[in-house]
Amino acid sequence: NQKYINVPKIRRRRFKVVLDCVNGAGAYSMPLLLKRLGCEVIEMNCERTGIFPRLPEPIPENLKATMQSVKKHKTDIGIVVDPDVDRLVLITEKGEPFGEENTITQAVKFYLSKKKGNTVVNLSTTRAVDDVASEYNCKVFRSAVGEANVVEKMKGVKAVIGGEGSGGVILPKIVFGRDALTGTAIMLQHLLEFGGKM
């Protein structure tokens, strides 16, 4: 939603990014998105083979080479997606995992700062989301674990944003499903507005 994502400003910032798509579906769309946002992209595991070069779960123990690459290339951020591009994992400029729970929390913070409304997360997502929502006098509703449950609840309470602590961001204005491309655009805009460091 370009109302909240300032594409020209992101392009001017020229973020330097390590991108790891585990040779999954993201290898088609993620490099294209980042390049259109003016990022300098260092691609890792972005071959369109569907053959995973490492264990595909985007957890720190599987991302050691990606974290080292962020440090080596002195990038602003590392962006990792899972094979079907619904989960987003970020790596700080220091080469440290940002934490999937932090991703959903910061995405909610950014979006509620632009558009107030209800948020839905699952029962296992961090309570930090509630703290962020309360800053904007917004309500958080909880659903059972699972994307379908979160989406159903979002529709029921007309939520403006939702997701899960696993790094899945759901923005109904874009799609009623977890979407790492949407999460990436939100997080780059968030970085831009809050100083460029995580």
Sequence positions of predicted segments:
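Phosphate-binding chemistry for phosphorylated carbohydrates and sugar-nucleotides
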Residues: 1-194
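Mid-to-C-terminal polyanion-binding domains and interfaces
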Residues: 196-198
